[in-house]
Design a protein with these regions (language model features):
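Short beta-strand/loop segment that forms part of the nucleotide-sugar
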Residues: 31-39, 63-69
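Glycine-rich, basic loop-to-helix element that forms the pyrophosphate-binding segment
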Residues: 67-87
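Short aromatic/hydrophobic "clamp" motif used to bind/position activated sugar donors
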Residues: 92
Length: 247
């Protein structure tokens, strides 16, 4: 089984080394690692080159790509798609430049995939960490059929997807700036694909990010997406509740 990782980055020098250190410390290292850089002007590219020099002698293929720009395409899902198109692995993980793995993350994913060969993706619980390094909570994957109309039921940083699944249902919709992952999970669910699960948290996610800083747009996108897939009434209720609570 060939495992590929993708990290998209832009001026990520503050957190990137922590992410890369967690990859080098894996008990099962990735076979391939592709970076899509959005035009960094800080030390991001230097850090990536240093990582490449450390990783490649162990057999990991590392490529650093400049992000391609497409008119009217949201930058983050567009960069994800560029990485997906470039990698050659059987399973693909997306590691954000401010997130990091537990040392057993990829080994755990591989074990679950071997035990559930018919699944389309694997979901890992993700630990939310504040700016001081303290755990706020753990986001455990939720039942898609119950929670999908209301919320994103899976932590995207903990999602490892087979390349065959992307081939079957497509990559990310670049029309959504914030909630392209939510749209993708809806398509996964509608296609009737199976999801397998890792029991323990394997990913650490630093709180913040685009969705948390643009809550109104995130609410509007999730309402639009859920309505598109036939859950307008439930999605509208969830939208109103989030509007009232400011979430």
């Amino acid at each position: 089984m060939k495992i590929s990782l993708i990290t998209i980055c832009w001026n990520s020098e503050r957190t990137l080394s922590r992410s890369l250190k967690s990859v080098l410390e894996q008990t099962r290292r990735p076979d391939e690692y592709v970076f899509v850089d959005g035009g960094s002007t800080d030390r991001t590219l230097e850090i990536l080159e240093e990582f490449k020099a450390k990783a490649e002698p162990s057999g990991m293929a590392v490529r650093i790509l400049p992000q391609e720009r497409h008119e009217d395409a949201a930058g983050i899902p567009d960069a994800w798609n560029q990485g997906i198109s470039d990698v050659t692995g059987d399973v693909i993980g997306m590691l954000n430049s401010d997130d990091w793995y537990e040392s057993t993350a990829l080994e755990s994913v591989e074990t679950v995939l071997e035990a559930h060969p018919n699944c389309g993706a694997v979901s890992c619980p993700t630990r939310f960490v504040n700016e001081y390094g303290r755990e706020e909570k753990v986001f455990y994957p939720k039942c898609l059929s119950v929670f999908l109309p209301f919320m994103m039921p899976l932590p995207h940083p903990g999602l490892f997807v087979k390349q065959a699944t992307y081939d079957f249902i497509g990559k990310y919709n670049v029309g959504y700036k914030i909630s392209a992952d939510y749209d993708w999970v809806w398509r996964f669910y509608k296609a009737g694909l199976k999801l397998a699960y890792v029991k323990d948290p394997q990913v650490n996610m630093e709180l913040g990010g685009l969705a948390n800083s643009n809550r109104e747009q995130a609410r509007n996108e999730t309402l639009k997406i859920a309505s598109r897939y036939g859950a307008k009434r439930l999605a509208r209720m969830a939208w109103l509740l989030r509007k009232i609570t400011g979430r």
